[in-house]
Every structure is written in structure tokens, then in C-alpha cells.
């Protein structure tokens, strides 16, 4: 006769897992039926184990009744492809200059490589994900932007800022029970001036722009009335006194972030500005989460303590 026994340690582990599930229950109940926008980026995009874990997290959100919308960039993959094609990357003030030649690569990599791979990973769990880009169905609209270096205006080429979102295409995919996966390129529009009435004032140029995935995700979250914006990055969260790791901020209000923003490290400014924009435009919560940790998004969303940094409206200081 075969006898099976369970060690005390394994039973303790099982009880810990049960406790984690019970802890998640009120958060699942709270966010079921809401839309969550997740910006996918950083190391989570290039590490195979983390990529698989991210896809599992998205499918988990889907199955507990949350409507995930994934927005992604692809900086590492773009750099790799430009190198393989012998196209030199130019940077001004730390920002990439996107030439027409480089823009062709950006579109190819974001929509044809990164987006397709992520859709495939999610769909390995079932027919859930649908890929789209900011060009599809007039989803995103952008204006060309530059930057200032040492007091001088600098042209960054085909780089833009999202100024409009038509969420109808995303809503159609969500209503069909699917998961939208959005790559961040956007058609360029120009302002015809006050003399042009109504919607005709903003005209497409036929050009496509490379847009920042953090700010694009914030714009999409605002347009959808999302309950959460989650930005995956390569740090644990926002620090009050970087690089002091003990100064990690677990939660702060929009006003507190607004005061801190000018003093932040340059790499964190676009991410935290995106969080602030989302909160200012009605998103309930915005989170910065360490994408180097597998399943970090679930830990931040479904545990009481969380592991990253959340930004909340001024009138609500408690999570």
C-alpha cells in the first residue's frame, strides 16, 4: 500500500497561499468590472521569465473580472534592431532623435515584433489578446514636440506628444471579452489655428510619430475612465531621497507629487508626470511597480501593503 504524507513545512506553505488568496479577495471585489491600464516596459520586456510572468498576470486580471488594457513601448528592441541594420542612434539632451529612417524601424519593431510577441504570450493561455497600434481606428493623435538643451530648442525629429484619444476601438475589443495590446505610435496632427472651426482645426499630416509609452498610457487610462494606471519600470518605486533605498514612498497624493516633480531624477520625471496626469484627469489610482520582480503587478494590486508607489487624489489619502 502506498502511503502519502505531507510535511509540516508544506502545510504551512499551503496555509500561507490560502491567506494570500483571502487577502486578495476584497481587492478583487473592489476592482472587478473596472478597466486597468498597464504600461509594459523596462526589464520585464527583455527577460523571458518576466515576459511569461507578465502575460500570466494579464490573464489572471482578465479571469477575476478586471478589464486589462496593455500599452507598450520597446526601447531595448528598437535599439537592437537599429544596431542590426547599421542605423546610428542619435540622442540630444538624453532623448532619441527619430529620423524618418529610424521611424520605419520603430513602427516595424513596436507593431510587428514587440506587440505580436506579447499577444502570442497572452494567447498561449487562451484566445484573449488583440494587437493594435495608435494608428488603428484613430486611436491616438499626436503633435510633434522637441526639447530644450542648455536653453536652446532642439528638434527631436518624428517624436510627438499624445493630445487626443478616441477609445472606441479599445472599448469594442473589451466588449468582445478580449484584451487590447497597444503599441505607441500615433498619427501626427497640426493645429490650423483659431480661424478653422471645430474639429477641422486639427488636420492629419500623413506622418506617424514615435510617442512616449508612459504618457500614452496615461492618456488612454484617462480616456477610458480607468480605475488604475500601472507603470512597470526598473526601480522599486518612487524614493523620497534617491539613492537611499529606505526612502521608498508607498503612497502619496497628487499635490505631494506635484511639489516633488521638479526635484526628481530625470528618468523618473516622465513616469511620475504620467501618473499625475492620470490622477488629475480622473483615474482613481496610479502606480509605479518594479517590473524586475515577477508578478509585482499582482502584489501591488491585490495585497494590502503593496510593493511599489501609488499616487492617489488629494481628497483620498488612504488606499
Curated annotation (Swiss-Prot):
Domain of life of the organism encoding this protein: Bacteria
Keyword Amino-acid biosynthesis set for record: yes
Localization (cell): Cytoplasm
Keywords per UniProt: Amino-acid biosynthesis, Arginine biosynthesis, ATP-binding, Cytoplasm, Kinase, Nucleotide-binding, Transferase
Gene Ontology biological process: arginine biosynthetic process via ornithine; L-arginine biosynthetic process
Matching InterPro entries: AceGlu_kinase-like_sf, AcgluKinase_fam, ArgB, Asp/Glu/Uridylate_kinase, Glu/AcGlu_kinase, NAGK-C
Residues involved in substrate binding: 74-75, 96, 210
Entry's Gene Ontology molecular function annotations: acetylglutamate kinase activity; ATP binding
Top enzyme category: transferase
The protein's Enzyme Commission number: 2.7.2.8
Gene Ontology CC terms, in alphabetical order: cytoplasm
UniProt xrefs under PANTHER family: N-ACETYLGLUTAMATE SYNTHASE (PTHR23342), N-ACETYLGLUTAMATE SYNTHASE, MITOCHONDRIAL (PTHR23342:SF0)
Function: Catalyzes the ATP-dependent phosphorylation of N-acetyl-L-glutamate.
Record's protein name: Acetylglutamate kinase
Gene source species: Pseudarthrobacter chlorophenolicus (strain ATCC 700700 / DSM 12829 / CIP 107037 / JCM 12360 / KCTC 9906 / NCIMB 13794 / A6) (Arthrobacter chlorophenolicus)
Lineage of origin: Bacteria, Bacillati, Actinomycetota, Actinomycetes, Micrococcales
Amino acid at each position: 500500500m502506498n502511503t502519502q504524507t505531507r510535511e509540516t513545512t508544506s502545510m504551512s506553505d499551503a496555509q500561507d497561499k490560502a491567506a494570500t488568496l483571502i487577502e486578495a479577495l476584497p481587492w478583487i471585489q473592489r476592482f472587478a468590472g473596472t478597466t486597468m491600464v498597464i504600461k509594459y516596459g523596462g526589464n520585464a520586456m527583455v527577460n523571458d521569465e518576466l515576459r511569461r510572468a507578465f502575460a500570466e498576470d494579464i490573464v489572471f486580471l482578465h479571469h477575476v473580472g478586471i478589464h486589462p488594457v496593455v500599452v507598450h513601448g520597446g526601447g531595448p528592441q528598437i535599439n537592437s534592431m537599429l544596431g542590426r541594420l547599421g542605423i546610428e542612434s542619435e540622442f540630444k539632451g538624453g532623448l532619441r532623435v527619430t529620423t524618418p529612417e529610424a521611424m520605419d524601424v520603430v513602427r516595424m519593431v513596436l507593431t510587428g515584433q514587440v506587440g505580436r510577441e506579447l499577444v502570442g504570450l497572452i494567447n498561449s493561455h487562451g484566445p484573449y489578446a488583440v494587437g493594435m497600434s495608435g494608428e488603428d481606428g484613430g486611436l491616438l493623435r499626436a503633435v510633434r514636440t522637441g526639447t530644450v538643451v542648455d536653453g536652446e530648442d532642439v528638434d527631436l525629429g518624428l517624436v510627438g506628444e499624445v493630445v487626443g484619444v478616441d477609445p472606441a476601438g479599445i472599448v469594442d475589443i473589451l466588449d468582445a471579452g478580449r484584451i487590447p495590446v497597444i503599441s505607441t505610435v500615433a498619427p501626427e496632427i497640426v493645429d490650423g489655428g483659431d480661424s478653422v472651426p471645430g474639429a477641422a482645426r486639427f488636420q492629419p499630416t500623413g506622418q506617424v510619430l514615435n510617442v512616449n509609452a508612459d504618457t500614452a498610457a496615461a492618456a488612454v487610462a484617462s480616456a477610458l475612465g480607468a480605475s488604475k494606471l500601472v507603470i512597470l519600470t526598473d526601480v522599486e518605486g518612487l524614493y523620497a531621497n534617491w539613492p537611499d533605498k529606505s526612502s521608498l514612498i508607498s503612497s502619496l497624493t497628487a499635490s505631494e507629487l506635484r511639489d516633488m516633480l521638479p526635484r526628481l531624477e530625470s528618468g523618473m520625471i516622465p513616469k511620475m508626470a504620467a501618473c499625475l496626469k492620470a490622477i488629475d484627469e480622473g483615474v482613481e489610482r496610479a502606480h509605479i511597480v518594479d517590473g524586475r520582480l515577477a508578478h509585482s503587478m499582482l502584489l501591488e494590486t491585490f495585497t494590502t501593503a503593496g510593493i511599489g508607489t501609488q499616487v492617489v487624489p488629494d481628497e483620498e489619502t488612504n488606499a
